[in-house]
Amino acid sequence: MVQGYLTVALGKGRLAKKAMEAFEKIGIPCDEMKDKDTRKLIFVNEEKKIRFFLAKGPDVPTYVEYGAADIGIVGEDTILEEGRNIYEVLDLGFGKCRMCIAGPESSRKLLQGREVIRVATKYPKIAKDYFYNQKHQTVEIIKLNGSIELAPIVGLSEVICDIVETGTTLKENGLLVLEEVCPLSARVVVNQVSMRMENERITEIIRGLKSTTIDM
């Protein structure tokens, strides 16, 4: 029986770089991806019959749900925001950060009361779930795509819901973390049909990737 290819979608940027380092550790390198001048869209390890491609983070769960990719590696923030029908199978332990509610110190008291406040965010689904289902606070959510930190500074919102790594950008703009929504990191996701049809191969990859997280 001829073995088909497994396809892996990687979220562009640092996560993809770290993910490929992990794949290399378990004997699945992809030298084609190291060529910075390449215009290729699909990268192949012929020996292992595995194809890789890079995609914008929010698109990775979509590729996986619809079967264009069997496996995806993407941040937990994207998984929560997109809400796709996929299996989340492994926390890779890198790309760690936090989803937080941030704003000026003066906004802290607004998070304790019943007053309707405005929340600017790139993640409306996560923000809505946090405020409505966990805090039971009514808010107006404003979806933005650019620098979220700008919103409370210019009076568009009282607080923001955004990813925080070091907090330096917040501090430089007179903002601080007021509440933590949830911790985040890179995750492995799998297409539901692929998990059944290619269970042995996918399980072997997951097991290998899991072994790379032990030293982290």
Q: For the regions a protein language model found, what residue spans apply to each?
A:
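Domain-level signature for soluble enzymes in the chorismate/prephenate branch of the shikimate pathway
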Residues: 1-216
